[in-house]
Amino acid sequence: MRFYQELQLNQSGSKELIRQSKTTKEKLYHIAVYLFKIAITVAFCFLFVTLFSILFGSENSIAGVVVLLCIMVFRQAHFEIHAGQSTVLLALFFINMTVCSHLAHKLPPVAGLLVNIVALAILVFLGCHNPSMFNQSTLVLGYLLLYGYDVSGKSYLMRIAGMAVGAVLTCIVFYRNHKHRTYDKHVKHILQEFDLSSTRTKWQLCQIICVPVVICIAELCDMPRAMWAGIAAMSVILPLMDDMQYRVRKRIIGNIAGVICFTVLYFLLPSPIYAFIGVIGGIGVGFSTQYSWQAVFNTFGALAIATQLYGLKGAVSLRIIQNVFGVVFALLFCIIFHWFVSKIKVKEVL
């Protein structure tokens, strides 16, 4: 395997290559390549978001994160349909994330709930057809980040401009990398495959309904950072209930561990470099292949921002409460939803 090809591997691929090394020299080489890949990835991400913030305003740095996430994911991920139609869908998703997230945030919680359901239905039904691709971790996460860090006035106009540029860049990268792939399916085939008896459709509906409901309840309870609960719910909703229960446990444990680690760093490090704790978290995620460790390090970035607004005690309390509420509610919702759908199918048979 050539150097460039090895750089294209994900964390699991790189770690597997290291494990399969036959000599110490070979193992050290693969470790060096892996560390170099992490370093250039972190540097690229930092420079990209910094440049985006300079061009479109610091309040839109989160939009830069969303654009960066889409570019990095969709250079490899796809929608399993015709490349041309997929590219059009990708542009539609950017419009959806930019417009609907802003509209939903401006409305009262219940009205915003309806907008969020419609917006997520477009993203999930058309963009998350294959659960194993985990496209929801990009599209739904991106939507929720823009929703949670909404802006208005001139800043929103700059966000529109930034997301438009991001859409063009992502579509170019996506089409360039996928234009030679052949898929027999088109958009109409995806819509025709809607079936309440299928595991995939039930999973999609849980994502579409549960995540907005979680956010709505959090907002009605006047919880700041309601989108944290939505992100937590999104991340644990999986097609198979056993997998979902596993993720719920790991999310709660990982979040508490992340809060403890962040608190320790907060007291050990000097205040001028608190913001870099989020960078440490990003590096940690880069090294992580297991969901539990990703949950730990993802906590760093969220708390690095929240502590500036709510203080350490407030941010930590919010993080734990929102995440536990989000994942537990999602688990209960999915159990009830699956039971309800099974009852409907039984009545149809009778």
Label each PLM-derived region with a short phrase.
Residues V42-T50, I54, L89-H102, N116-F125, ...:
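Transmembrane alpha-helical segments of multi-pass membrane transport proteins and ion-pumping complexes
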Residues P212-L265, L269:
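Transmembrane helical segments that form the transport core of multi-pass membrane transport proteins
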Residues L51-E59, G84, M97-A111, G153-G162, ...:
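Membrane-helix interface and helix-disruption motif detector
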Residues M1-L35, H178-T201, S342-L350:
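Intrinsically disordered, low-complexity non-transmembrane regions of multi-pass membrane transporters
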Residues A39, S86-A91, L113-I117, Y156-A164, ...:
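Hydrophobic alpha-helical transmembrane segments
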Residues M1-L90:
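N-terminal signal-anchor module of multipass membrane proteins
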Residues V42-F46, E59-A77, L113-S152, A167, ...:
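Pore- and pathway-forming membrane helices of multi-pass small-molecule/ion transporters and channels
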Residues S101-Q192, L196:
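Membrane-interface helix-loop-helix junctions at boundaries between adjacent transmembrane segments
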